[in-house]
Amino acid sequence: HHHHMRVILDGVFNHCGRGFWPFHHLLENGDASPYRDWFIVKHYPLRPYPQHHEDPNYAAWWSIPSLPKLNTNNPGVRDYLLYVTRYWLDFGMDGWRLDVPAEIDDDDFWREFRRVVKDANPEAYIVGEIWHPAQRWLKGDMFDAVMNYQITGPIFNFFGSHNLNLSWHHSDVTLKTGTGAEEFRQKIEAMFELYDWEIHYAQMNMLDSHDMPRALWLLNNDKAALRLAVLCQMTMPGAPCVYYGDEIGMSAGGDPHCREAFPWQEPAWWDQDLRRFYQSVIALRKAHAALRTGDFAFLHAEGQTVAYRRRLEGEELVVVFNASNREAGIKLSTKELSASTYQVLWPEGEDKTKRAWFGRLSLELPAQSALILRAGKEEAS
């Protein structure tokens, strides 16, 4: 906190490690252990290190013996988990990221979890790892947000439409080539229809994570496409999440390769231009509240070009993308804009003004490029 950072813990409440002390007690004492009902035991003896094809005799996450599943129906387990929840918030943690919370199929537990969290810190952030649409958990009585994989596929499919690695598959993140602007618009608008707008401002928007290939790998190392995808992520409603190492050009396939250590000892390997790009777009988002909590509306979606508006309390920004590999021109109607004069905010260093004529704001964009414009004081006639 002294460094203006907030820390969110990863809470794994569905299962534990094989070294968890109540599980050790159960292994040592069997049915005589007071913790026998903390787990889902099939029969004794338990086999924490089963041989091939042997049943460990207890429920485990994905049948992995080293990850015994907790019996969250047991009052002792519930009390312990809620004690842990409160303990770390009182210690000073700022929220919880919940691992596989859908596997604890108990809304009452999560409602009580929320009450404990918000009682300790009303500003604490609760974000669940739910890959699919999560209306059940986002009604205001359980989570604040989820890891928003619903935005991941549309962003990759649009900005990587001509050069996407399709060798990775997941039922909740559909990747495909050939996605145009209109389909991108439809997917994003369908995502926005899932929840109340207050939820979207809190959603953990991500391009990749420890559970999937890195963004650059999925884009076949196309750094121009990556920059557009990141710029889109940073200008959409939500809380953008950067997976460590993406900002220096780390590229790897799925688990475990995507989890390799950050190369602290090899700074010469880092892509410093890409790192500076990340710093710039993050600074841009921080500098303009409209990009964080402004309203959102598409202005244009045609071919491989997209434009949308972010607006808040008199500030209007227009974000424009050309995802194709050739130059493209677009025209925006001033009927949906608040001004006829716009200043270029992005790319940085371009001290240019764009002016609308005859009800149209005409823009020319190079291949795989973007513009961010800020409305001037002159109002449209």
Spell out what each predicted region is.
Residues 237, 242, 248-381:
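Carbohydrate-interacting/catalytic domains
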Residues 1-3, 14-15, 20, 24-31, ...:
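Active-site-proximal helices and loops of the catalytic beta/alpha 8
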Residues 199-219:
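Active-site clefts of carbohydrate-active enzymes
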Residues 1-91, 113-119, 135-136:
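Substrate-binding/active-site clefts of carbohydrate-active enzymes
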